[in-house]
């Protein structure tokens, strides 16, 4: 990613005010999102299709069937425990699908954050993270992968090579960790217009990290379970722009006043949305 790369978080007016006041973004349970296949997509849909591809290969049937049995059992557990937490951004500032789904039908706002600010200031790596005793390995930011036949083929190839080289131990040495690695980023392809980038976190509740070196809070339980990351430190901030929805109650002057009242500064670009959505 370039030195400054803006991504956009669509929200309601109340959420906008809360973000300004708290100066943090919430990382929430991704399995509670609007896509009911979050995480499950990887461990159920993707895995089922990868299995069919593996069954067409030259892997000995006893090795493959044993591995599939072990992985099937493990994946039933995976979709019920240790969900990833995340905050989602769009790579497009002003599109109707985002306004209607996340921006309160154009009554909200689109907030432009520099994703690289979080890398440089919160020490969040550009990576697809995985559960780890080292906190910096358990959190990362990257683009969402929209499920495709090409991606299925890539995953099947990884599994094939692991099974050929490691036999029945491949499921624990490679296959399970790889699917876990991608589970917070694989989505139903019908959501592709969202052009999503995420910050994803894999905490392990009740277990302390051996190394804590990232600016992320402990678990918060007010309103709902979540973790928090700061987007401002001193005079440095990730918030670079605010796009006001076509039907938003706030004017540019109102937004400027809120920024000043919350000591955000005067260098945030404010603009009006060009999405002329009619509320019916």
Place the predicted regions along the sequence by residue.
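Partner-binding and oligomerization surfaces adjacent to conserved cores of proteins
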Residues: 1-280
């Amino acid at each position: 990613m370039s030195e400054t790369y803006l991504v956009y978080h669509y929200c309601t007016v109340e959420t906008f005010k809360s973000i300004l006041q708290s100066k943090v973004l919430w990382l929430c349970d991704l399995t509670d999102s609007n896509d009911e296949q979050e995480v499950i997509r990887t461990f159920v849909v993707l895995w089922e299709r990868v299995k069919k591809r593996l069954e067409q290969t030259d892997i000995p049937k006893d090795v493959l069937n044993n591995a599939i049995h072990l992985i099937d059992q493990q994946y039933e557990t995976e979709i019920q425990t240790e969900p990833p937490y995340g905050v989602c951004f769009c790579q497009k500032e002003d599109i109707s699908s985002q306004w209607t789904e996340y921006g309160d039908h154009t009554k909200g706002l689109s907030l432009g954050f520099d994703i690289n600010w979080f890398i440089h200031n919160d020490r969040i790596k550009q990576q697809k993270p995985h559960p780890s005793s080292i906190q910096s390995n358990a959190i990362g930011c990257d683009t969402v992968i929209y499920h495709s036949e090409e991606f299925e083929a890539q995953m099947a190839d990884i599994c094939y090579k692991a099974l050929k080289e490691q036999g029945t131990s491949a499921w624990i040495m490679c296959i399970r960790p790889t699917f876990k690695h991608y589970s917070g980023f694989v989505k139903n392809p019908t959501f592709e217009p969202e052009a999503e980038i995420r910050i994803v976190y894999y905490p392990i509740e009740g277990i302390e990290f051996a190394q804590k070196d990232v600016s992320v809070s402990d678990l918060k339980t007010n309103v709902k379970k979540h973790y928090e990351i700061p987007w401002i430190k001193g005079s440095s901030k990730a918030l670079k722009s605010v796009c006001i929805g076509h039907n938003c109650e706030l004017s540019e002057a109102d937004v400027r006043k809120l920024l000043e009242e919350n000591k955000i500064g005067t260098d945030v670009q404010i603009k009006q949305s060009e999405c002329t959505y009619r509320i019916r």
